[in-house]
Curated annotation (Swiss-Prot):
It comes from Mus musculus. Belongs to the Ikaros C2H2-type zinc-finger protein family. The keyword Cell membrane does not apply. Its main location: nucleus. This is Zinc finger protein Pegasus. The gene is Ikzf5.
Amino acid sequence: MGEKKPEPLDFVKDFQEYLTQQTHHVNMISGSVSGDKEAETLQGAGTDGDQNGLDHPSVEVSLDENSGMLVDGFERTFDGKLKCRYCNYASKGTARLIEHIRIHTGEKPHRCHLCPFASAYERHLEAHMRSHTGEKPYKCELCSFRCSDRSNLSHHRRRKHKMVPIKGTRSSLSSKKMWGVLQKKTSNLGYSRRALINLSPPSMVVQKPDYLNDFTHEIPNIQTDSYEAMAKTTPTGGLPRDPQELMVDNPLNQLSTLAGQLSSLPPENQNPASPDVDACPDEKPFMIQQPSAQAVVSAVSASIPQSSSPTSPEPRPSHSQRNYSPVAGPSSEPSAHTSTPSIGNSQPSTPAPTLPVQDPQLLHHCQHCDVYFADNVLYTVHMGCHGYDSPFQCNVCGCKCKDKYDFACHFARGQHNQH
């Protein structure tokens, strides 16, 4: 019974020696302890350990396993973090700070037993061991590429699939499950966009924009539930695109998907004898612009029936390709304020072979040169080139030209000599 009483005292003594070894190791790294004191302290600690019959764990293992233990000799910042003595790095745990100090000291305790490889980080050694075992746990979700390191997989995604890693809050769903959903969705969608993928679950919900509330109730055979179910339906007549090109959060993508549904509807109130001419002259077209990476603009025109009015129908060109500007007239609706070329009575899968023809009534006309301008700014700049006294006199240099051809050649040469 008398031999068991000193055991608590011996345990406290051994624990104090254990802390002394840790403190001594850190001081040895920082260079604050001389070599003679180091040898004496280590020899004394080893002698006491042999006398007590206890085997103390190594310093390297103890630092990793007891990251929450505070070690004397480290300076703390104002927020309680442990600060590095060589730079401004600070960490809450001791283990991470010790790993950081190895960058300055060059210490590499983690060594490979198959080759001379050594590293200051245990995770680097684990990645190196996969080169010996041939294990490749990281797989690309878009192709059959496999690698042994996460950084190689990120480099492969940026180089092959043009994907940029997105910084933000992590989703509750796993990345593999989200990639499966994105791949399934890209196989159904037919409109291409640049790769802008957000792994948050709310981004998969297609919301109805507020600026569509003004005219969705007036479009025939289009209901609200059909727009809300766009994420589950497959638009007809879509162009086959690369599955990598997917955009979820852009409202323009929602408009283009709605345009695909509008184009799939059969036209109403149309004269079968003359398909190129609108039957009702009071119908106003509605255009939805769809920008793409190839700079190809495609729009879908849907007929919106208006109330009957006693006004006489206005003559329209017989071609199917038209351009509508914001100055279409007082009868234009506020929703059709976007000036985009449209292709009438055609599916989105049919590319436009030629540029749309401008309506002469909607353009700005220079009566001197007989030139039409679709933009008011270009028209104003052009009219400023004509002189005030003579229409074919250059307003820049005062050169008098014979006719409109000589006037155009003068500005094409750009030789404005002041007289």
